[in-house]
């Protein structure tokens, strides 16, 4: 699947993002190994009714890598807090998929006064040791992965072969 690459701006902490529309703000956070284009279908339909903001997590898409070797949910949450304080500057709905869902939940708990609502999609819970090992391997290989091929495989797994309407 080919997706439409969205134009990006960058925050002062080098998080790449796409923003369009007006009204209530919705922040979209993707999962491991993906990029903001994984939200293209949602952005396409919601931008006419909302202020949609999708980010590339640090180390993904066009965002810079985290400088800290301590890459965990808390460090991502703190970076996103800095981003929302600078870029959104008002209450918003936070939406995340997979890793993004974990970050969204952590953000909503820590900064509940920033959020009008939360959507957590495909959030993981109690991974086995084998699943954690596979996830860590995937995280360590992100820099060398062909992201388009990775997104194609993920999209095919979710939606089947005929998924052109989702990009």
Label each residue range with its predicted role:
Residues 1-26, 47-51, 85-90, 156:
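Alpha/beta-hydrolase fold catalytic core
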Residues 23, 31-35, 98:
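Active-site glycine-rich loops that stabilize anionic/oxyanionic intermediates
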Residues 31-41, 52:
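Serine-hydrolase catalytic-loop signature spanning alpha/beta hydrolases and amidase-signature enzymes
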Residues 126-134, 144-167:
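Conserved alpha/beta-hydrolase catalytic His-Asp/Glu region
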């Amino acid at each position: 699947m080919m997706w439409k690459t969205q134009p990006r701006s960058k925050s002062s902490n080098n998080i790449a993002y796409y923003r369009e529309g007006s009204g209530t703000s919705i922040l979209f956070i993707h999962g491991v190994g993906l990029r903001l284009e994984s939200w293209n279908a949602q952005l396409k339909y919601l931008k006419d009714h909302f202020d949609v903001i999708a980010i590339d997590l640090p180390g993904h898409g066009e965002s810079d890598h985290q400088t800290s070797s301590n890459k965990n949910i808390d460090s991502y949450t703190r970076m996103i807090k800095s981003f929302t304080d600078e870029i959104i500057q008002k209450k918003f709905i936070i939406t995340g998929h997979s890793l993004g869902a974990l970050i969204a939940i952590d953000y909503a708990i820590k900064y509940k006064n920033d959020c009008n609502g939360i959507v957590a999609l495909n959030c993981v819970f109690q991974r086995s040791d084998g699943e954690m090992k596979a996830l860590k391997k995937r995280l360590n290989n992100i820099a060398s992965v062909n992201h388009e091929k990775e997104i194609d495989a993920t999209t095919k797994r979710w939606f089947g072969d005929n998924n052109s309407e989702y990009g």
